[in-house]
């Protein structure tokens, strides 16, 4: 099955809750998914460094 069709299928609401797939809402990546932000780690890092995610900042100690 083509990647684009898998992304579209994963974003649709499933008939049963157990069929839900966690995919990034921005790029469709299935791995490295962060539930709290509904995006993958790569998109999260990009958007957080640009300051587009409120309340998230780079940690330093």
UniProtKB/Swiss-Prot annotation:
Binds 1 zinc ion per subunit. The keyword Plastid does not apply. PROSITE patterns: RIBOSOMAL_S14. InterPro entries: Ribosomal_uS14, Ribosomal_uS14_bact, Ribosomal_uS14_CS, Ribosomal_uS14_sf. Binds 16S rRNA, required for the assembly of 30S particles and may also be responsible for determining the conformation of the 16S rRNA at the A site. Part of the 30S ribosomal subunit. Contacts proteins S3 and S10. This is Small ribosomal subunit protein uS14.
């Amino acid at each position: 099955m083509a990647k684009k069709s898998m992304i579209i299928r994963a974003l649709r609401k499933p008939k049963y809750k157990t069929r839900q797939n966690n995919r990034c809402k921005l790029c469709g990546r299935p791995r490295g998914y962060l539930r709290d932000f509904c995006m993958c780690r790569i998109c999260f890092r990009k958007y957080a460094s640009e300051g587009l995610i409120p309340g998230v900042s780079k940690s330093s100690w």
